[in-house]
């Protein structure tokens, strides 16, 4: 796995911890935060993660989108990482995961989806280009 982090500097940030009853409550609260940002700024940029934890959040967001309550048409996304050596068509890739669990279920412009290329010949150049695109 590789991530697009080259000239990373750390800054002090405060984190608010939110306690929830269960996974469903956590998923809905996370979806509320994301949807509020999209409503506030329809062309916002989201940083997205993979794995089992955000699936409930993605499901809730897709449900609101299907009902017409949330519009992803102007949203851009950047995924955090990708497995090196895996094609985007490989079911084990994060690219595949995101389309299967989220992007195929919302009205996002596919040109606004950004995921690292796991088959990039030059991973340093891939990460540098990704980092520049995020800026």
Q: Where would I find each of the regions flagged by the language model?
A:
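Intrinsic low-complexity, disordered N-terminal segments enriched in polar/charged/small residues
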Residues: 1-3
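N-terminal glycine-/serine-/threonine-rich phosphate-binding loop
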Residues: 6-46
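Ligand-binding beta-strand-loop-alpha-helix segment within the catalytic cores
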Residues: 10, 14, 70-135
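Acidic/polar N-terminal loop/beta-strand segments that form early-domain functional surfaces
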Residues: 20, 49-51, 80
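Short alpha-helical
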Residues: 25, 52-56, 121
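Short, glycine/acidic-enriched capping/hinge loops at junctions between secondary-structure elements
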Residues: 30, 57-60, 88-90
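Glycine-rich N-terminal segment of FAD-binding domains in flavoprotein oxidoreductases
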Residues: 40-65
């Amino acid at each position: 796995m590789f991530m697009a982090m080259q000239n990373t500097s750390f800054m002090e940030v405060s984190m608010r911890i939110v306690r929830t009853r269960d996974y469903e409550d956590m998923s809905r609260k996370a979806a509320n935060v994301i949807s509020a940002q999209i409503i506030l700024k329809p062309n916002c940029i989201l940083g997205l993660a993979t794995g089992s934890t955000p699936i409930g959040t993605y499901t809730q967001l897709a449900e609101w989108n299907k009902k017409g309550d949330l519009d992803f048409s102007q949203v851009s996304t950047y995924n955090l990482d990708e497995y090196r050596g895996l094609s985007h068509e490989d079911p084990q890739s994060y690219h595949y995961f995101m389309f299967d669990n989220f992007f195929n279920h919302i009205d996002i412009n596919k040109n606004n989806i950004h995921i690292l290329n796991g088959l990039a010949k030059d991973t340093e150049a891939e990460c540098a280009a990704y980092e520049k695109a995020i800026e």
